Amino acid sequence: MAGKGGLRILLTGASGLVGQGVALACQRSPQVGHLAALVRRPGSLSGAGRELVVADFLHVQGRSDEQAGFDACFYCAGAPPVGTAEAEYRRVTRDITLAVARAWATANPEGGFLYVSGAGADPQSRLMPLRIKGETEVALQALPMRSVMLRPGGVRPVSGTGTRHGLLKPLYWGGAPLMKLAGAVAPSLMTSNLALGQALIALAGEEHPPGTVECADINRIASGARDPAS
């Protein structure tokens, strides 16, 4: 829950497609009083906010004191499921996420850890990305902290944000009209990175948020939280 100065948010993955939209939502939201980003390199956070530079997130535990005093961690970092080998995908998606989460649980046992997972995440899935995300969800839920798993389907970039991955840029550029249409007619399959940020902020402000939030509910929560003037 927010203090008098608004929510204090720690963000990971600020330079990625999801994180860019989430950062923008935080910077625009009157509910957010302070935004900091856990980054590997300076300059990863665009716009207002403070950066906490940690070169290797696997060793963030030694600096857990820097994570103290936040209301929620929005964990948006990850590897693209396309073109990433399984060992690397597991290292980034599970191992690094859990390293940050353990440090977070030490520094903020009452704070919320909101993890951007994916639709269909299941530790028993035959699809490698969904299986590893499912394993990560189970491990996060076992830690001594409040956690929320958000499971977006497709995520489209809006408001000038985009992917850094060269292989995916043509897909997002060419598929933008179809993705926008899908978001309108099939909210259970598609959301935007800005809507994801709006939903994260709304959930962080709840005293008892749900443990798992599917794509349609992400859009519903974002719609209810959105400023009509924005």
Residue ranges of each PLM-predicted region?
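NAD(P)H-binding glycine-rich loop region in Rossmannoid oxidoreductase-like domains
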Residues: 9, 50-99, 103-106
